[in-house]
Amino acid sequence: MHEGVQVSSKLEQLQALLAPVVEGLGYQCWGIEYVSQGKHSVLRIYIDKEGGILVDDCEAVSRQASAILDVEDPISSEYTLEVSSPGMDRPLFTLEQFASHAGEQVKIKLRSPFEGRRNFQGLLRGVEEQDVVVQVDNQEFLLPIDSIDKANIIPSFD
C-alpha cells in the first residue's frame, strides 16, 4: 500500500510540474504515467490537440519537458522520457475522460482485486460520483477511480 501512495504523490508532483508546460505550448495534457522498472523507469506524457498530434508536436513537448525536468529533478533515478498522442487505444486517467468515452469498450486493471478480480473488460457505462461504471457481460461494476491502475479504450474497427 505504501508504495502506491509514493507513486501517486510522485504522479501528482509530475502532473503539477509538467501539465502547465504542455498546456503552455498549446496542447492538452491528456495524462502522465510513471512506470518504475527496477533501475530504469519510464515517464510517459500523453498530449492531445484538435486535429491530432504530429511527431513535431511530441518533439516540442519533449524538449520543454526535458528542460524543466533537468532543472527541477523530481526523479532521482535513471528514466526514459516518452511523449506521444493517446492513440486509438487511449489510456483514461480522469473521471471526465471516462464520462466522455461512455458507450465504448474498455479494458481496466485494478491495483488490487475487487469482487475477486483485478481485470475488467466490457462496456464503459459512464461515471457515478467517484466510480467508473463498467458492464461485463450482463453485470455492472462500480469501480472506484482511485483503485484503477490502468484503463484503455479498446478500439473498434467497425
From Swiss-Prot:
- Answer whether the UniProt record assigns the keyword ATP-binding to this protein: no
Entry's localization field: Cytoplasm
- Keyword presence, NAD: no
Pfam families (UniProt xref)? DUF150_C (PF17384), RimP_N (PF02576)
Q: Name one GO biological process term.
A: translation
**Keyword tags:** Cytoplasm, Ribosome biogenesis
Q: Which CDD domains match?
A: YlxS_C (cd01734)
Residue pairs linked by disulfide bridges in the UniProt entry: none
Q: What NCBIfam families has UniProt attached to this entry?
A: PRK00092.1-1
Task: Give the similarity note.
Answer: Belongs to the RimP family.
* Annotated function: Required for maturation of 30S ribosomal subunits.
Stated name of the protein? Ribosome maturation factor RimP
Q: Which organism is it from?
A: Pseudomonas putida (strain ATCC 47054 / DSM 6125 / CFBP 8728 / NCIMB 11950 / KT2440)
